[in-house]
C-alpha cells in the first residue's frame, strides 16, 4: 500500500518524535476471522519474477498473521486519522481494566508492528 522508507530515514524522523503523537497506518490488508479477530495478509513475494515463478506452486499468495483480541482492536483503529494517544484512550474505554497499562502495551505492540514493516507512521510519509 505505502512505499517503505529506509532504515536511516525512519530513524531520523522518529528520533525526536513523541510516540503517542504519531499516526499509524497499516501497510497490508486484512480479513476478519470467525471470532471477530483480524488476520493480517502479508504478501509472500515482493518481486515480479519470484511471484511469477514460485507463486503458482503455493496455495496462497499471502502469509496470514492472526492477531488476538487486543491486537485486532488496535489494528482496526489504525486508520491514519487517529494518533496513538487517541487509540489508547479508545481502547481503554472499549476494554476497561483488561488493557491496563494501555499506553505501555499499545506502544509496545505498535513498535513491534513497525519494526516488522506491518505499519508505517503518517509522519514518515510526510517527510518523503
Each model region followed by its residue ranges:
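Hydrophobic packing positions characteristic
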Residues: 1-47
Amino acid at each position: 500500500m505505502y512505499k517503505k522508507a529506509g532504515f536511516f530515514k525512519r530513524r531520523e524522523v522518529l528520533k525526536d518524535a513523541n510516540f503517542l503523537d504519531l499516526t499509524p497506518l497499516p501497510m497490508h490488508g486484512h480479513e476478519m476471522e470467525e471470532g471477530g479477530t483480524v488476520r493480517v495478509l502479508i504478501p509472500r513475494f515482493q518481486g515480479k519474477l519470484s511471484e511469477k515463478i514460485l507463486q503458482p506452486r503455493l496455495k496462497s499468495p499471502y502469509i496470514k498473521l492472526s492477531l488476538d483480541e487486543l491486537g485486532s482492536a488496535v489494528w482496526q483503529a489504525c486508520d491514519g486519522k487517529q494518533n496513538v494517544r487517541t487509540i489508547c484512550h479508545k481502547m481503554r474505554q472499549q476494554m476497561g481494566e483488561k488493557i491496563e497499562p494501555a499506553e505501555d502495551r499499545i506502544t509496545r505492540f505498535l513498535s513491534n508492528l513497525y519494526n516488522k514493516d506491518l505499519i508505517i507512521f503518517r509522519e514518515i510519509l510526510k517527510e518523503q
